C-alpha cells in the first residue's frame, strides 16, 4: 500500500509510446488514479489494435506499461467498463 496519494503520470490526450504491442499509438481518452492498485485505470482508443478499438487498461506508473486490457467495439461500452474498474 502507498504511503500517500497516487499521483498520475499520464494525462488525457497522451499518445502511448508502448513497446510495439497493442498499446503503441493508443490515445488516452480518460484516466483516473487508483489508490488501491497504485496505478491508473485508463480508457484508450487504439485504432491499430487487432482487437476492438476501445480498451481499458491498468497503467503502471513505475514501468509505464499497460496490462489487463478489456476491449470493446464502442466508446460507450469502454466507458462503462472504465467506470466499473474504478469501483472494483
What are the language-model segments listed below?
Residues 2-55, 79:
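Short N-terminal "domain-start" leader segments
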Residues 71-88:
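A short, charged, amphipathic alpha-helix used as a generic interaction element across diverse proteins
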Residues 40-68, 84-87:
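Short aromatic-glycine-(Arg/Gly/Cys) micro-motifs in beta-strand/loop hairpins
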Residues 31, 69-70:
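Residue-level detector of high-confidence beta-strand sites
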